[in-house]
Amino acid sequence: MHPTEKIVRQFHESWDMCDPERGAEIIADDCQFEDVARGEKQPGKEAYKADYHRWREAFPDGICKVENVIVSQCGEWAMVEFRNTGTNTGVLRSSLGDFPPTGKKAEVRYCSVMRVKNGMVVEGRDYYDSATIARQLGLVS
């Protein structure tokens, strides 16, 4: 397994293992994350941990399963296709406001584009269809 693949898998598997510290240990202090669907930038380890806890609050039973990892020829970049599933039993906090629990299950496919340097994640962007989440949770029809 390419070292970059190992790092990005550790990052995503930390969500599934309910272990944000495992993910944080391979995030550079000056890492820049961006949630493209929400239009939010999340700089550094603390922002990563806050986002982890925001998601875990909304989906306490949430599971993150990596489906594919493709590493670029230069070895710095990886594309990670993964699937998040969970039941919305907690408040879903977002840039659009806070939504009360719906008790409904959501299953959404994501794509992360991540850059790894010297064994640390230095940049990442998540792409997903937020309308799919809203429909599955009954927030829109």
For the regions a protein language model found, what residue spans apply to each?
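C-terminal and inter-domain tail/linker signature
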Residues: 1-141
